[in-house]
Amino acid sequence: MFLGTYTPKLDDKGRLTLPAKFRDALAGGLMVTKSQDHSLAVYPRAEFEQLARKAAAASRSNPEARAFLRNLAAATDEQHPDAQGRITLSADHRRYADLSKDCVVIGSVDYLEIWDAAKWQQYLEEHEENFSTASDESLNGIF
């Protein structure tokens, strides 16, 4: 399970060091893709394969499903962390997430998110109220 908040630096070559506690779970390969809110999502390969299969099972006659699958496939990059636990983020991914040297990696239970540190802080400030007022209906009855 991926939990917590970490603040690695992005180096000049576009490499980001993944938190040490997640390296074993990601050692078999990982998939980096564009996510919502102009962040990046990092999935273990097996988890991403399940997501991709579900997306591919949607009706191809539905334009939204087709567009989602097309964008998901085109925006995904397979990575294998190096001996120091670093992955190289593509220029396209860095541009999409507007990443500076200061990044934030957050655990999102079954995947990781990579954010620019300033954008993550802004997101937290804008959505703080949502956390404390989340309704049971929107969270599928977990409370």
Swiss-Prot record:
Pfam families: MraZ
Locations listed in the record: Cytoplasm, Nucleoid
SpoVT-AbrB domain mapped to chain residues: 5-47, 76-119
Biological process terms in GO annotation: negative regulation of DNA-templated transcription initiation
One GO CC annotation: nucleoid
Domain of life: Bacteria
Nucleotide-binding keyword on record: no
Keywords: Cytoplasm, DNA-binding, Repeat, Transcription, Transcription regulation
GO molecular function: DNA-binding transcription factor activity; transcription cis-regulatory region binding
Gene3D superfamilies, per the entry: Transcriptional regulator MraZ domain
Family stated for the protein in its record: Belongs to the MraZ family.
Subunit-level organization: Forms oligomers.
Database matches in HAMAP family: MraZ (MF_01008)
Name of the protein this chain belongs to: Transcriptional regulator MraZ
UniProt source species: Mycobacteroides abscessus (strain ATCC 19977 / DSM 44196 / CCUG 20993 / CIP 104536 / JCM 13569 / NCTC 13031 / TMC 1543 / L948)
Recorded name of the encoding gene: mraZ
